[in-house]
Amino acid sequence: MKIWIDADACPRVIKEIVFRASERLRIPVCLVANKNLAKHATHLVESIVVGEGFDVADDYIADHAAPEDLVITADIPLAARIVAIGGVALDPRGELYTEENVGERLSMRDLMMELREGGLVQGGPSQFSLTDRQRFASSLDRLLTRLIREMRPVS
Protein backbone atom coordinates (compact mmCIF):
# COMPACT_ATOMS: atom_id res chain seq x y z
CA MET A 1 0.00 0.00 0.00
CA LYS A 2 1.09 3.53 -0.79
CA ILE A 3 -0.56 6.89 -0.14
CA TRP A 4 -0.53 9.25 -3.13
CA ILE A 5 -1.17 12.97 -2.61
CA ASP A 6 -2.28 15.27 -5.41
CA ALA A 7 -0.02 17.87 -3.81
CA ASP A 8 -0.48 21.09 -5.78
CA ALA A 9 -3.77 22.05 -4.14
CA CYS A 10 -3.62 19.92 -0.99
CA PRO A 11 -3.54 22.01 2.20
CA ARG A 12 -0.27 21.78 4.14
CA VAL A 13 -2.09 20.68 7.30
CA ILE A 14 -3.53 17.68 5.43
CA LYS A 15 -0.08 16.68 4.20
CA GLU A 16 1.20 16.89 7.78
CA ILE A 17 -1.60 14.63 9.03
CA VAL A 18 -0.74 12.11 6.31
CA PHE A 19 2.99 12.29 7.15
CA ARG A 20 2.27 11.52 10.81
CA ALA A 21 0.10 8.54 9.85
CA SER A 22 2.80 7.39 7.43
CA GLU A 23 5.43 7.43 10.18
CA ARG A 24 3.17 5.72 12.70
CA LEU A 25 2.06 2.95 10.33
CA ARG A 26 5.20 2.77 8.13
CA ILE A 27 3.25 3.47 4.92
CA PRO A 28 5.10 5.15 2.04
CA VAL A 29 3.75 8.45 0.70
CA CYS A 30 4.24 9.91 -2.75
CA LEU A 31 3.55 13.62 -3.33
CA VAL A 32 2.97 14.52 -6.98
CA ALA A 33 3.02 18.17 -8.06
CA ASN A 34 3.79 20.54 -10.94
CA LYS A 35 6.26 22.50 -8.81
CA ASN A 36 9.12 21.73 -6.44
CA LEU A 37 8.05 20.65 -2.98
CA ALA A 38 9.83 20.91 0.36
CA LYS A 39 12.16 18.02 1.18
CA HIS A 40 11.17 15.62 3.93
CA ALA A 41 13.35 14.11 6.62
CA THR A 42 11.88 10.63 6.26
CA HIS A 43 12.59 8.02 3.63
CA LEU A 44 8.87 7.19 3.61
CA VAL A 45 7.97 10.40 1.75
CA GLU A 46 8.85 10.77 -1.91
CA SER A 47 8.21 13.89 -4.00
CA ILE A 48 7.71 13.72 -7.75
CA VAL A 49 7.65 16.87 -9.84
CA VAL A 50 5.89 16.40 -13.16
CA GLY A 51 5.84 18.80 -16.09
CA GLU A 52 3.64 21.84 -16.29
CA GLY A 53 0.25 21.40 -17.88
CA PHE A 54 -3.37 20.65 -17.25
CA ASP A 55 -3.90 17.34 -15.41
CA VAL A 56 -0.26 16.22 -15.73
CA ALA A 57 -0.01 15.40 -12.01
CA ASP A 58 -3.43 13.72 -12.10
CA ASP A 59 -2.39 11.61 -15.08
CA TYR A 60 0.81 10.56 -13.31
CA ILE A 61 -1.10 9.46 -10.22
CA ALA A 62 -3.76 7.63 -12.23
CA ASP A 63 -1.09 5.84 -14.26
CA HIS A 64 0.97 4.76 -11.23
CA ALA A 65 -1.51 4.15 -8.40
CA ALA A 66 -2.46 0.53 -7.71
CA PRO A 67 -5.87 -0.70 -6.54
CA GLU A 68 -4.55 -1.22 -2.99
CA ASP A 69 -3.30 2.39 -2.79
CA LEU A 70 -4.98 5.43 -1.26
CA VAL A 71 -5.14 8.70 -3.21
CA ILE A 72 -5.72 12.01 -1.43
CA THR A 73 -7.25 14.48 -3.88
CA ALA A 74 -9.87 17.19 -4.20
CA ASP A 75 -9.92 16.59 -7.96
CA ILE A 76 -13.14 14.70 -8.63
CA PRO A 77 -12.19 13.48 -12.15
CA LEU A 78 -8.98 11.99 -10.70
CA ALA A 79 -10.96 10.40 -7.86
CA ALA A 80 -13.32 8.89 -10.45
CA ARG A 81 -10.37 7.40 -12.33
CA ILE A 82 -8.97 5.90 -9.12
CA VAL A 83 -12.32 4.44 -8.07
CA ALA A 84 -12.74 2.99 -11.60
CA ILE A 85 -9.57 0.89 -11.17
CA GLY A 86 -10.76 -0.32 -7.77
CA GLY A 87 -8.63 2.14 -5.82
CA VAL A 88 -9.54 4.30 -2.85
CA ALA A 89 -9.76 8.10 -3.01
CA LEU A 90 -10.24 10.50 -0.11
CA ASP A 91 -10.98 14.21 -0.32
CA PRO A 92 -8.93 16.61 1.90
CA ARG A 93 -12.16 17.40 3.75
CA GLY A 94 -12.56 13.74 4.72
CA GLU A 95 -15.10 12.58 2.14
CA LEU A 96 -14.49 9.09 0.77
CA TYR A 97 -15.18 8.72 -2.94
CA THR A 98 -16.96 5.47 -3.75
CA GLU A 99 -18.51 3.77 -6.77
CA GLU A 100 -21.87 4.88 -5.37
CA ASN A 101 -21.10 8.60 -5.01
CA VAL A 102 -18.31 9.56 -7.44
CA GLY A 103 -20.60 9.79 -10.48
CA GLU A 104 -22.94 12.14 -8.62
CA ARG A 105 -19.99 14.25 -7.42
CA LEU A 106 -18.67 14.46 -10.98
CA SER A 107 -22.08 15.55 -12.31
CA MET A 108 -22.41 18.18 -9.57
CA ARG A 109 -18.91 19.48 -10.31
CA ASP A 110 -19.72 19.80 -14.01
CA LEU A 111 -23.01 21.58 -13.27
CA MET A 112 -21.34 24.05 -10.89
CA MET A 113 -18.62 24.73 -13.46
CA GLU A 114 -21.27 25.52 -16.09
CA LEU A 115 -23.14 27.78 -13.66
CA ARG A 116 -19.91 29.64 -12.80
CA GLU A 117 -19.03 30.05 -16.47
CA GLY A 118 -22.53 31.42 -17.10
CA GLY A 119 -22.16 33.89 -14.24
CA LEU A 120 -25.03 32.33 -12.30
CA VAL A 121 -22.86 31.24 -9.39
CA GLN A 122 -19.78 32.95 -8.01
CA GLY A 123 -17.01 31.67 -5.81
CA GLY A 124 -15.86 28.19 -5.03
CA PRO A 125 -15.78 25.89 -2.05
CA SER A 126 -15.80 27.32 1.45
CA GLN A 127 -12.53 28.09 3.20
CA PHE A 128 -10.78 25.08 4.75
CA SER A 129 -11.74 24.90 8.43
CA LEU A 130 -10.72 23.20 11.67
CA THR A 131 -13.78 20.96 11.30
CA ASP A 132 -12.58 19.92 7.83
CA ARG A 133 -9.16 19.09 9.26
CA GLN A 134 -10.67 17.01 12.08
CA ARG A 135 -13.02 15.23 9.69
CA PHE A 136 -10.10 14.36 7.41
CA ALA A 137 -7.94 13.05 10.27
CA SER A 138 -10.78 10.87 11.53
CA SER A 139 -11.64 9.57 8.04
CA LEU A 140 -7.99 8.84 7.28
CA ASP A 141 -7.53 6.92 10.53
CA ARG A 142 -10.65 4.78 9.96
CA LEU A 143 -9.75 4.19 6.32
CA LEU A 144 -6.13 3.19 6.97
CA THR A 145 -7.25 0.84 9.75
CA ARG A 146 -9.69 -0.82 7.35
CA LEU A 147 -7.20 -1.03 4.47
CA ILE A 148 -4.46 -2.51 6.67
CA ARG A 149 -6.90 -5.07 8.08
CA GLU A 150 -7.97 -6.05 4.54
CA MET A 151 -4.33 -6.49 3.48
CA ARG A 152 -3.39 -8.89 6.30
CA PRO A 153 -3.33 -12.53 5.29
CA VAL A 154 -5.87 -14.65 7.14
CA SER A 155 -4.17 -17.39 9.16
From Swiss-Prot:
Transmembrane parts of this sequence: none
The UniProt entry's coiled-coil ranges are none
Q: Which domain of life is it from?
A: Bacteria
Q: Which Pfam families match?
A: DUF188 (PF02639)
In terms of InterPro entries, this protein maps to: UPF0178
The family assignment reads: Belongs to the UPF0178 family.
What the entry lists under NCBIfam families is as follows: PRK00124.1
Name of this chain's protein: UPF0178 protein Gmet_1725
Q: Record the organism.
A: Geobacter metallireducens (strain ATCC 53774 / DSM 7210 / GS-15)
